[in-house]
């Protein structure tokens, strides 16, 4: 008896696999009923099923397009499209060049009408220093300091300040003013002396011309809102207690 165990010994006698294996087995070939390599029997052997598309299929004949590639096939690719980049800016002019010089206008515009008319309102005069002549041609020559004239004053030229409208008072001597004294008052008396004469007013105050009326009872003026007379006692207050007789 052989020590090697055969798969044909484990199958039943009438198994078609055993019959075909026994009858069609050739030296150096595996049985036809079993594949040459099985990943279950030999995990390290590569699978006999080809991966990917069959050799006869092309990407154009696949109904769903070519198979996606990359780490994330479902994400569309990003970035510029394949191919050479387009030139920027585009070559050539963006707008056609002008056809030539523009023609002269057929209707000429209005030309200058001449000197401008005299304004209705004179121009305001510029401020000038006090005493300067109104006519600039009458101004004298200016010295190195600007407004100060280097020569004598010409007749008609004003000074730095205008002439006052009211003449100044003369600086002559004035008489001493008299001391202030009220009319009818006594002359001043040196300190510490008593003036002669009686003290007090010159005459007593006059007596009143009439006597004041004696205070007394005066008649009450008529009151249109008098309370009608009633029983003795104070009238009852509104809302107060009432006496029943």
From Swiss-Prot:
Residues 34-51 have a biased composition (Low complexity). Residues 1-245 are annotated as: Disordered. Disulfide bonds: none annotated. Pfam families: MISS (PF15822). It comes from the Eukaryota. InterPro entries: MISS. The keyword Translocase does not apply. The modification Phosphoserine is found at residues 2, 6, 15. The modification N-acetylserine is found at residue 2. Residues 74-127, 164-190, 198-207 have a biased composition (Pro residues). Keywords: Acetylation, Phosphoprotein. Residues 17-26 have a biased composition (Polar residues). PANTHER family: MAPK-INTERACTING AND SPINDLE-STABILIZING PROTEIN-LIKE. Belongs to the MISS family. This is MAPK-interacting and spindle-stabilizing protein-like.
């Amino acid at each position: 008896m052989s020590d090697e165990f055969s798969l044909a010994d484990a199958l039943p006698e009438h198994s078609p696999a055993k019959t075909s294996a026994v009858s069609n087995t050739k030296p150096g070939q595996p049985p036809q009923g079993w594949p040459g390599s099985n990943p279950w029997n030999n995990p390290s052997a590569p699978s006999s099923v080809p991966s990917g598309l069959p050799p006869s299929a092309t990407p154009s004949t696949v109904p769903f397009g070519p198979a996606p590639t990359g780490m994330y096939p479902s994400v569309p690719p990003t970035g510029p499209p394949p191919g050479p980049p387009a030139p920027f800016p585009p070559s050539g002019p963006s707008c056609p060049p002008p056809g030539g010089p523009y023609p002269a206008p057929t209707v000429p515009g209005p030309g200058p009408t001449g000197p401008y008319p005299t304004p209705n309102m004179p121009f305001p005069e510029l401020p000038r220093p006090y005493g300067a002549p109104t006519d600039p041609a009458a101004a004298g020559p200016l010295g190195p300091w600007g407004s100060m004239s280097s020569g004598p004053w010409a007749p008609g030229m004003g000074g730095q300040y205008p002439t006052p409208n009211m003449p100044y008072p003369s600086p002559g001597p004035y008489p001493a003013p008299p001391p202030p004294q009220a009319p009818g008052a006594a002359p001043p008396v040196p300190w510490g002396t008593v003036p002669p004469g009686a003290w007090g007013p010159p005459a007593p105050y006059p007596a009143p011309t009439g006597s004041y009326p004696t205070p007394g009872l005066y008649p009450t003026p008529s009151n249109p809102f008098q309370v009608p007379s009633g029983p003795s006692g104070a009238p009852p207050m509104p809302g107060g207690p009432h006496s029943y007789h």
